[in-house]
Amino acid sequence: MHLMSFDRMSGVNPAKNFNTISAVLDIGSDKIVCLIAKNTNIENHKGKFELLGLGHQRSSGFDHGSIVDPSTLELSIRKAIEDAEKMSSLTIDKITVNITSDKVESNLFEVSIPINDTQVTKKELDKALSIVTEQNFTSDKLIFETIPLGFSIDGVDLIEDPIGMYGEKLNINLNNLTCTKGIIQNIQNIVESAHVRVERIIFSPIASAVATLSSDEANLGSILVDMGAGTTSYSVFSDNIFRYAGVVPYGGNNITIDIARSLSISLRDAEKLKILYGGVLTNSYDNGEVVKIRQLGFQEDTGSEKQIQKSTIADISRTRALDTLERVRVAIENISPSLLYQKRVILTGGGSQLIGIDDLASEIFQSPVRRAIPKAISQDFDVSDPIFSNACGMLTYSQNETFVNKKITTKGLSYFQGNNFFSSLMRWFKDNF
């Protein structure tokens, strides 16, 4: 299957989106971030948004990409949105939300449409979307996004916009993102219980890639790994093409739990140890340095402290980080070993701040590795922290309205039927990569 270049994929219509207000909500296991911004479409190194509001709350009731306590999660979401609204002096009624579940599937399709020496019209493109929806429909899953990747007519590729062209057969390559119906419906319900309508759902590893990858990295081949608290998500790019994305249900919180269990200490103390001494290069602490920590179940000043070698903490952290990154590598290899070939690895997210994680990732993937912060999106606020990569990418990615799925139905999503559905999408990727 031939996939088209990101350089031919589209973007927002400046005339349409200029000065529009957008809101995004990044729901994670550790934090919830709400951004409200105005799209200025002014291209410079400071970004093309005026960031109006930022809400940042500790997450509660959400773990490993799933809702585990709706009532407490609703309160966290409501507070993050309220904080962003207060800062912006605006009240929002719709929002873009992320999904970071290992139940999301990324499926490639090639659809052939006979055109019989007539002109390609919007009708043929709509037919292709309908075919993919029918092929990918199951009663327990929903399509939440379809990404067109490229076109060819009679075997000739490099067609940016096929509308108006003649030929015998039109081939369209698409990537369908699907997820278990209950997960999507639960996300919608919990957000809308805060009196905000879910306008769109975005897969987190794609958003993180938009926020962190350079054009050269997307072109030459890269694997983006977003190391969150409850999950680690990844997306693969080469030749400026989005190839694949997925999630493994392990993250930084698993390191904390491992430390707590192994050392018989509280989760709170384990988190402190992870932050202070949780590097993954064990030889950094081979000089026998120790740290004192209170044993689980004892109060302070009761003689319950015990000494723990820093190298022990690093060993525990390394074991879990290695397992998580290896799961990512194996998942990509199982799709296609070629996806790993000559790919640079880019790490982001809170877990990417672990000391030595870049060296460990280089060992596992046998590739160059860099740690990334999100590219500047606004000159008003500094969100250049890897924990904001997903939220920043969501803000940029959400500006493409040409393939927004407007309404979830029993067969997936009813697609926005714009006149330049595919060509607009291709321009967006060209503008943002």
What residues fall within each predicted segment?
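Glycine-rich phosphate-binding loops at beta-strand->alpha-helix junctions
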Residues: 30, 179, 279-282, 340-364
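Conserved phosphate-binding/catalytic loops in two-lobed NTP-binding clefts
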Residues: 122, 126, 364-392
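Short beta-alpha connecting loops at secondary-structure transitions
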Residues: 243-244, 257, 309-312, 343, ...
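Extended, folded domain segments that form the structural surfaces/walls around functional sites
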Residues: 192, 226, 323, 330, ...
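A short acidic Gly-Thr/Ser loop motif
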Residues: 25-31, 100, 224-231, 237-240, ...
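Nucleotide/phosphate-binding catalytic cleft detector across ATP-hydrolyzing
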Residues: 1-31, 35-223, 241-243, 266-268, ...
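Hydrophobic alpha-helical bundle architecture
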Residues: 331-339, 343-350, 364, 370-379
